[in-house]
């Protein structure tokens, strides 16, 4: 069976063969299989050495101190630790938190949990259509009792980039902690934590050709950020995250981050051309809309709404392409994407969206093929749509009164 063209890199990426090779060296008796917390023999020392080297590799990509990297099981855990950890530790200083309506569920759900614990959350509305959360919005929402602002650097559905450097200046001036979810940003945009005033940052390995099940939380040392641990046990990771370290996964994450640093700029340039080619081609169709900011974005995403076409039907028609409607974390529900709804899209347009996301194995031939089959599928589905016929006849659908069955 021929495999479909993979255009869902925002959901996950395959492990780079070089990363897999490094990981394999840490699994069997011949390799570095020891427990990094075993301080009394060489097996433990060797594992610890690999873990600390990987910590340096991750820190180097984001220009941080290796001692500021805390290993977790992924960005979801990192987000939970950052939000609940800071909120619970500093609750006596204030109970107000700012986030936005278009964050990942790994931020929104902990916020709901904190609301139940008595915290007050302000959910910022993004700019219509572009999805930008601006420094001005944050400035207007900051209060003396705001202890934390949590915003993503790159949105996982539309690829819009938030100006976290400018927002960091505002939060630092207000003596407010700033957490950034950078799961979709690492390896795609430059991150310099030696200059950015960001206190906590979440990462995941599987978004940049590393393994699933491993991530990290950057926790600033100066000015110091303290957290209330959410997982208790052996006191690993300076007490912030207990649990035996998975050496092979950590080594994989370190290797993936190092490789990303070497290829990032050239790869963004290459992918930008592919994205533009697909978007330019899709605009041959009528009633096609770009979701997200036209320029302030990363090249890896193209989120498009095809009016008068149901996104689920379109996905089913694109058997040769692996794409998603909404994000993979919420695509189990048939609800329209809450991110696109927050951008002001109608239910119909939100339902008709497809997210194409590109990566290092995407070729120009892939784009040509996907463009051809997408155009054909949209045209075929519109032929079946009575709404499309009405639109073509010049009927304003917003004025139509639908009879109840």
From Swiss-Prot:
Active-site positions on this chain: 329 (cysteine persulfide intermediate)
Main location: cytoplasm
Catalytic activities: (sulfur carrier)-H + L-cysteine = (sulfur carrier)-SH + L-alanine
Reported cofactor(s): pyridoxal 5'-phosphate
Enzyme class (EC, first level): transferase
Stored Pfam families: Aminotran_5
Keyword Iron-sulfur: yes
Residues that coordinate or bind pyridoxal 5'-phosphate: 75-76, 156, 184, 204-206, 244
N6-(pyridoxal phosphate)lysine PTM positions: 207
GO cellular component: L-cysteine desulfurase complex
Pathway this chain belongs to: Cofactor biosynthesis; iron-sulfur cluster biosynthesis
Localization (cell): Cytoplasm
Keywords (A to Z) from UniProt: 2Fe-2S, Cytoplasm, Iron, Iron-sulfur, Metal-binding, Pyridoxal phosphate, Transferase
EC number per UniProt: 2.8.1.7
Keyword Disulfide bond among record annotations: no
Quaternary structure annotation from Swiss-Prot or TrEMBL: Homodimer. Forms a heterotetramer with IscU, interacts with other sulfur acceptors.
Role summary: Master enzyme that delivers sulfur to a number of partners involved in Fe-S cluster assembly, tRNA modification or cofactor biosynthesis. Catalyzes the removal of elemental sulfur atoms from cysteine to produce alanine. Functions as a sulfur delivery protein for Fe-S cluster synthesis onto IscU, an Fe-S scaffold assembly protein, as well as other S acceptor proteins.
Family under the similarity heading: Belongs to the class-V pyridoxal-phosphate-dependent aminotransferase family. NifS/IscS subfamily.
Protein name from the UniProt record: Cysteine desulfurase IscS
Lineage, top ranks: Bacteria, Pseudomonadati, Pseudomonadota, Gammaproteobacteria, Moraxellales
Gene: iscS
């Amino acid at each position: 069976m021929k495999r479909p063209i993979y255009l869902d890199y925002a959901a996950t990426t395959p492990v780079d063969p070089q990363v897999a090779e490094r990981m394999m060296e840490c699994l069997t008796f011949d390799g570095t299989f020891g427990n990094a917390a075993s301080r009394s023999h060489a097996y433990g020392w060797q594992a610890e050495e690999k873990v600390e080297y990987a910590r340096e590799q991750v820190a180097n990509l984001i220009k941080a101190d290796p001692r500021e990297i805390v290993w977790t099981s992924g960005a979801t855990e990192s987000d939970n630790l950052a939000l609940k950890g800071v909120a619970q530790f500093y609750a006596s200083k204030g109970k107000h938190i700012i986030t936005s309506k278009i964050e990942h569920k790994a931020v929104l759900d902990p916020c709901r949990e904190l609301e139940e614990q008595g915290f007050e959350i302000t959910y910022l509305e993004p700019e219509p259509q572009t999805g930008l959360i601006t420094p001005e919005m944050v400035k207007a929402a900051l209060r003396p009792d705001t202890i934390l602002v949590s915003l993503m650097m790159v949105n996982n559905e539309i690829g819009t980039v938030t100006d976290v450097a400018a927002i960091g200046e505002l939060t630092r001036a207000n003596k407010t902690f700033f957490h950034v979810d950078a799961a979709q940003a690492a390896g795609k945009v430059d991150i310099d934590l030696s200059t950015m005033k960001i206190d906590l940052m979440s990462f995941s390995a599987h978004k940049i050709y590393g393994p699933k099940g491993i991530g990290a939380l950057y926790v600033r040392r100066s000015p110091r950020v303290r957290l209330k641990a959410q997982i208790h046990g052996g006191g690993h990771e300076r007490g912030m995250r207990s649990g035996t370290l998975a050496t092979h996964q950590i080594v994989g994450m370190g290797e993936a981050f190092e490789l990303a640093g070497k290829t990032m700029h050239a790869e963004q340039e290459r992918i930008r051309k592919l994205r533009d080619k697909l978007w330019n081609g899709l605009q041959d169709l009528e009633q096609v809309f770009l979701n997200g900011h036209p320029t302030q974005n990363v090249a890896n995403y193209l989120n498009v709404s095809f009016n008068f076409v149901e996104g689920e039907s379109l996905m089913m028609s694109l058997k040769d392409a692996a794409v998603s409607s909404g994000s993979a974390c919420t695509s189990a529900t048939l609800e329209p994407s809450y991110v696109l709804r927050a951008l002001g899209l109608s239910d119909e347009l939100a339902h008709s969206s497809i997210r194409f996301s590109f990566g290092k194995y995407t070729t120009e031939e892939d784009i040509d093929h996907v463009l051809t089959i997408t155009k054909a599928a949209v045209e075929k589905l519109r032929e079946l749509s009575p709404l499309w016929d009405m639109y073509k006849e010049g009927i304003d659908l917003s004025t139509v009164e639908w009879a109840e069955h």
